[in-house]
């Protein structure tokens, strides 16, 4: 049986763990996404490359350690890639439900001083553009689904593929940069801002260190082991 606790000691952040899995299982399937009725596979190498390009693209935009990056949309590979890429540059990820009300989205993004938001599609882009004046720190909006957005010309907008291309170019100029960024991540550093229920007032942002979450996962897996032959279906919203 795998030594889960030892693996977490070796890779105590999500970017480190992804890099380790890509090295050991690069050509194996890590994720699948259903698109037009067909399951599209992504290998661990695909996954790692997407994360690296997102991370270096954000570095190219001037984002750095301590910056808050918002993510809003459905469960999809780009959500996970955006979150791990955020951690890779030392940023803090802030996930929002795709049906979040405008008032709550504005409050949370402003409270977290989010500088960039990954948005799934036109619906989320419209929501963010409508809130822009209330979230002054927001400088960039990256969308994954370009349908309906061709005629949008707001300077804050860019597609996920444009961000990927920026990251790819940065990788060519500095091939060792991404590994240096990942090596600098620490399990005790806050990586995730998780919204509380907000039953009595505005939601608060609970601060989670990635290392603690991964250690919890290791304890769980020690009692209910999982391996390469097991598959999960992502149903509950990712925030």
Where in this protein do the model-derived segments appear?
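Conserved AMP-binding/adenylate-forming core of the ANL superfamily
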Residues: 30-84, 101-106, 159-164, 208-211
């Amino acid at each position: 049986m795998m030594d889960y606790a030892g693996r977490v000691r070796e890779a105590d952040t999500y970017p480190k763990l992804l890099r380790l899995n890509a090295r050991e299982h690069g050509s194996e399937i890590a994720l699948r996404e259903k698109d037009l009725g067909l399951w599209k596979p992504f290998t661990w190498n695909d996954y790692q490359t997407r994360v690296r390009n997102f991370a270096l693209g954000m570095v190219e935009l001037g984002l750095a350690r301590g910056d808050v990056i918002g993510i809003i949309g459905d469960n999809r590979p780009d959500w996970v890639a955006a979150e791990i890429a955020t951690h890779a540059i030392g940023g803090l990820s802030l996930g929002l439900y795709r049906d979040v009300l405008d008032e709550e989205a504005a409050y949370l993004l402003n409270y977290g001083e989010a500088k960039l938001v990954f948005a799934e599609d036109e619906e989320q882009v419209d929501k963010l553009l409508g809130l822009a004046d209330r979230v002054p720190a927001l400088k960039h909006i990256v969308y994954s689904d370009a349908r309906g957005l061709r005629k949008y010309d707001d300077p804050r907008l860019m597609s996920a593929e444009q961000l990927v291309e920026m990251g790819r170019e940065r990788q060519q100029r500095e091939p060792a940069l991404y590994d240096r960024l990942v090596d600098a991540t620490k399990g005790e550093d806050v990586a995730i801002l998780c919204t509380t229920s907000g039953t009595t007032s505005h939601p608060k942002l609970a601060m989670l260190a990635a290392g603690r979450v991964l250690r919890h996962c290791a304890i769980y897996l020690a009692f209910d082991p999982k391996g390469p032959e097991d598959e999960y279906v992502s149903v509950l919203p990712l925030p």
